[in-house]
Amino acid sequence: MRKIIQEKLNEGKVLHFSLFDPDKVDLESIYSIALKLVESGTSGFLIGGTLGVSKEKLDSIIEILEDFEVPKIIFPSNVNLITEKADAILFMSLLNSDDIYYITGAQLIAAPIIKKLKLESLPTGYIIVGHGGTAAHVGKARVIPYDNIELIVAYSIMAELFGMDFVYLEAGSGAPEPIRPSVISITKKYLENSKIIVGGGIRNEEIAKELALAGADIIVTGNIIEQNLEKALKIVKEISNIRR
């Protein structure tokens, strides 16, 4: 998956990932929603959520998505959300957590399981900014203010120096505003290899385009897919047409 993602980015594309929260999604409608997202240009599916997620439902969603050629990637909140049915897993460390469990503890428990399942891992530095939402509360994150560019950049550089392939800047599910394009632009200048993933609070194609042009490599939307699919499809189409 890492190679596929990198090849697309090397072509100058900006990628869109659709996030499905197993606790919120309707299994009966997910196939038709996924079909529209793929037809609009989404590059991958992230499956996961912070609360109320069972492995059984995670497996069910991935099985429904099997017909689609785009990657199915686990977006884990804990060690119980690991399945061999996925193509890969975001092997995330919540870098600005005050609880070591979310920095290296859960990862220590998960690592042998991931190895045994031969599941491809995508090393990711997860950094919660601004609103933070449920993920910040559960993960005991020391949330970075939207305008503290210096701290966001420092955490991002740290992720890259740790050898992480991705820096995931997260404003939180349902955030009142997304991470600012100016923050992305400045952060991008300091990263040589790590790719920037941005999620949270992205509600229209205009802000998605601004984030993409500012330097985001992958843009994630989740809530908007559940709340207003037509708007979500516009975002996907806008991103899939961008070349840098």
Curated annotation (Swiss-Prot):
- Report the domain of life of the source organism: Archaea
Enumerate the residues binding sn-glycerol 1-phosphate: 168-174, 200-201, 222-223
- Which residue spans traverse the membrane? none
Alphabetized UniProt keyword annotations: Cytoplasm, Lipid biosynthesis, Lipid metabolism, Magnesium, Metal-binding, Phospholipid biosynthesis, Phospholipid metabolism, Transferase
**Residues engaged in binding Mg(2+):** 21, 50
| Gene Ontology cellular-component terms listed | cytoplasm
Question: What residue stretch is flagged as signal peptide?
Answer: none
Q: What are the BP-aspect GO terms?
A: glycerophospholipid biosynthetic process
Q: Where in the cell is it found?
A: Cytoplasm
Instruction: List the pathway annotation.
Output: Membrane lipid metabolism; glycerophospholipid metabolism
Q: Does the keyword Lyase apply?
A: no
The catalytic activity of this protein is classed by the Enzyme Commission as 2.5.1.41
Q: Which HAMAP family match?
A: GGGP_HepGP_synthase
Its job: Prenyltransferase that catalyzes the transfer of the geranylgeranyl moiety of geranylgeranyl diphosphate (GGPP) to the C3 hydroxyl of sn-glycerol-1-phosphate (G1P). This reaction is the first ether-bond-formation step in the biosynthesis of archaeal membrane lipids.
By sequence similarity, the record places it as follows: Belongs to the GGGP/HepGP synthase family. Group II subfamily.
Listed PANTHER family: HEPTAPRENYLGLYCERYL PHOSPHATE SYNTHASE, PTHR40029
Q: What protein am I looking at? A: Geranylgeranylglyceryl phosphate synthase
Query: From which organism does this entry originate?
Result: Sulfurisphaera tokodaii (strain DSM 16993 / JCM 10545 / NBRC 100140 / 7)
User: Lineage in the entry?
Assistant: Archaea, Thermoproteota, Thermoprotei, Sulfolobales, Sulfolobaceae
